[in-house]
Amino acid sequence: MTDHGRTAIVMSRLPRLVDPHALWLRGLRAALRRIQEHGGTVVRIRQTAGSDFIQRGAERLGLPVDVIADGSSTAGNDASDTDIHTVRDRRVMSAADTVLVLGIRAQGNIHRALVEYLASGGRVELVDLPGLQPSTVRDELIRLGASTWPPSAEDQAPFNGTSDAPVQSHHSMSVYEIVPFPPPDQWVFLSHSTRACPGPWPHQSFCDYADSLLDELPDADHSASATLARIVAQRRVISSPQSNRGQHPVVCLTEVPLMELPLLRQYQVHRTRWDFEPFGVCVDRDWLQSRGARPVIYGDEATWLQLSDADRPYFQLCPAQVESSGDPGPKTDWRIEREWRHVGDLDLQHLPRDKGLVFVPTFEVAMRLAGISPWPLTLAPAPIDAI
């Protein structure tokens, strides 16, 4: 790499949920340190894959960053998202002296742009980590003139070192306890299923989120399991206005017994995620009701118009096709969820041990939560698609 050169770091589109141990993150740390070592400048365009992480990583290392115009206006008014991304990828490469390549997909925008860039005499270095690029793509780019750079373990290391310490709490179970969940005819709980949290945690800034990944901190894991651990450790379920007409922040629960929960599990295409993951907390219905939780009011537009402001946070449009007419897929009758809602965050600080239950899919996950949960743990029934 030329000293004091302008360097672009490129990669294919990232998954919504970032794995804190992902190869591209290791490669990104290494690439930024390489630019720092050579006194270079980072070149980036907003809204390209990983651009915000590149920006934050450069800030952490004190690297100068040149943010250039994305050139999307040159793609034309009728340009597709693919066309716009292609313009941006080509533009950031043309503005750089060297392009450092992380993960790429075969025949993706980055792959095609790199082939063109190499044909024009551009300088390309592949960050050489096993599995970071498909071998066929890697071999092709090398034949076209790309070089490889194998970063050391030190290059890839978290910026501030890593901590494998588990989340701690001043409350803990002295005995690891797995209990059977009550049968449907004895079910007295309302259940809240947790799911992964792509992007920052509620009330977390993007900078803090990016730092947790660059530093490989324990809270960088935003999986459904980690979300549940966070709820248990904080003794609080954070409310959300998502999927709530009127944008009222609520916590959603279901009175469907845990044994029957897998029957509700389905993939929501418009949200690109599954509903009713096998992670969550069950809370005694009477305890919740005494704190304001109420059953959802299912109805149509006429029902909504008749509701008071106090009742509207509990409204759910039904039948679903009235609200989802643009969705060509099958419609859901939300009444099968038998939903309850709690307006605002749900504080579990004073939930008695016999009024709560934590459900997880495996013994391994249960063992990780045993040290922080004041409530017993149970194994959730397997999802229908996993049987």
Provide a role label for each language-model segment:
Residues 149-387:
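NAD-dependent ADP-ribosyltransferases
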